[in-house]
């Protein structure tokens, strides 16, 4: 405990560590193949869903209370169970009673909480990210651009009625845009992160867009956008294969930004995932551990095997923040780690 004295305002006691890290390694699970975790999701039933590269979906029941892992609380789903593909890159909880599952292709499946089975819905290929704008519209990021899927429902069973492609042409030229990340800024603006083509600010109502490039500094990997976040102070952040970028302003013909790389104290340049905690810190997953970044003080701190993490080399797409607990999850080559903010003990004693 750290005791802090004030001038006439009493004494405050704060616990030393504000965060707790939890690990689950693939070696702890009753599965034969050990493949990198590429997607993460939790649900209201305390299930932890892990999408893997080439080993299907792993569901850990009551994950926060589990002490051991066996076939009684770990279920694996593969193509034999209805998955479209065993390489799973994204999850999204639907407004309906299903879980969307996106994979290498042919593309999209869903898990029904009603019948507890996996079903296929679309042949979209190489789907890395998905956003359910409403119960009738899905936006899907794939290797050939952006897809808008129009969905109808029979009860809790979805049916794709129409598919429309966007961003297949940029500046009048045929362009194969590989979309890796999405961030919904509001109900009309969707930010898209691409492999090598920068970021796109896309209007879901009009179909108009602005392509924002950061490689004016002569470093092409900075346009390899792996994750996007708008923080609580309305600052837009982009994680890439060459560090962290803050978008300061953007006009039609001009972009102003601030970049952070290993040259500026960032512990590792590859930023796979990014989330913000309630204190305004950004948490970044990298090739060498988890990085805590204070955007105001511009101070970095790294967590890895030296600080007790069993998972410290992370994967693209594998980042998630639970709306149920606030915990931040990152998936890696040998498992998953999550951090939860501990309640800071405030013991205020005011002298008489």
Residue ranges and their predicted role:
Residues 1-352:
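Carboxylate-rich, polar loop motifs that coordinate divalent cations or form catalytic acidic clusters
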């Amino acid at each position: 405990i750290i005791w802090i004295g004030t001038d006439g305002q009493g004494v405050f006691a704060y616990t030393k560590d504000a965060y707790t890290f939890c690990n689950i390694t693939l070696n702890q699970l009753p599965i034969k193949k050990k493949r990198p975790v590429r997607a993460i999701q939790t649900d209201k039933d305390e299930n932890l869903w892990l999408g893997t590269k080439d080993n299907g979906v792993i569901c850990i029941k009551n994950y926060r209370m589990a002490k051991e892992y066996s076939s009684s609380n770990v279920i694996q789903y593969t193509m034999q169970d209805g998955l479209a593909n065993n390489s799973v890159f994204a999850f999204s909880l639907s407004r309906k009673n299903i879980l969307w599952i996106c994979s290498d292709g042919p593309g999209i499946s869903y898990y029904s909480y009603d019948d507890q089975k996996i079903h296929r819905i679309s042949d979209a290929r190489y789907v890395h990210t998905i956003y359910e704008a409403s119960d009738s519209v899905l936006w899907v990021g794939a290797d050939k651009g952006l897809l808008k899927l129009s969905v109808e429902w029979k009860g809790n069973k979805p049916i794709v009625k129409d598919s429309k492609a966007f961003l297949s042409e940029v500046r009048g030229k045929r362009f194969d845009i590989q979309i890796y990340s999405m961030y919904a800024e509001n109900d009309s603006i969707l930010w898209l992160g691409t492999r090598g083509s920068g970021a796109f600010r896309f209007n879901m109502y009009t179909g108009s867009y602005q392509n924002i490039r950061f490689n004016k500094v002569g470093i092409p990997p900075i346009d390899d956008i792996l994750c996007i976040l708008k923080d609580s102070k309305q600052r837009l952040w982009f994680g890439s294969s060459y560090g962290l970028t803050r978008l300061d302003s953007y006009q039609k013909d001009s972009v102003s930004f601030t970049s952070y790389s290993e040259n500026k104290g960032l512990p590792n340049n590859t930023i796979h995932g990014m989330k913000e905690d309630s204190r305004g810190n950004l948490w970044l997953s990298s090739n060498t551990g988890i990085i805590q970044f204070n955007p105001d003080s511009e101070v970095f701190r790294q967590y890895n095997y030296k600080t007790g993490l069993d998972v410290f080399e992370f994967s693209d797409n594998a980042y998630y923040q639970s709306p149920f607990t606030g915990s931040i999850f990152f998936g890696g080559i040998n498992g998953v780690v999550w951090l939860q903010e501990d309640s800071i003990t405030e013991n205020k004693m005011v002298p008489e």
